[in-house]
Amino acid sequence: SSGGGEGSGMWFGPRL
């Protein structure tokens, strides 16, 4: 959970 897309919470992008 470092600002990526995990679960159903994509805050920034795929995996930043």
Swiss-Prot record:
UniProt-listed GO biological process terms: neuropeptide signaling pathway
Protein's UniProt keywords contain Ligase: no
Subcellular location: Secreted
Domain of life: Eukaryota
InterPro entries the UniProt entry points to: Pyrokinin_CS
Location of Leucine amide modifications: 16
Task performed by this protein: Myoactive.
Family in the record: Belongs to the pyrokinin family.
Protein name, entry field: CAPA-Pyrokinin
Species this protein is from: Austrophasma gansbaaiense
Organism taxonomic ancestry: Eukaryota, Metazoa, Ecdysozoa, Arthropoda, Hexapoda
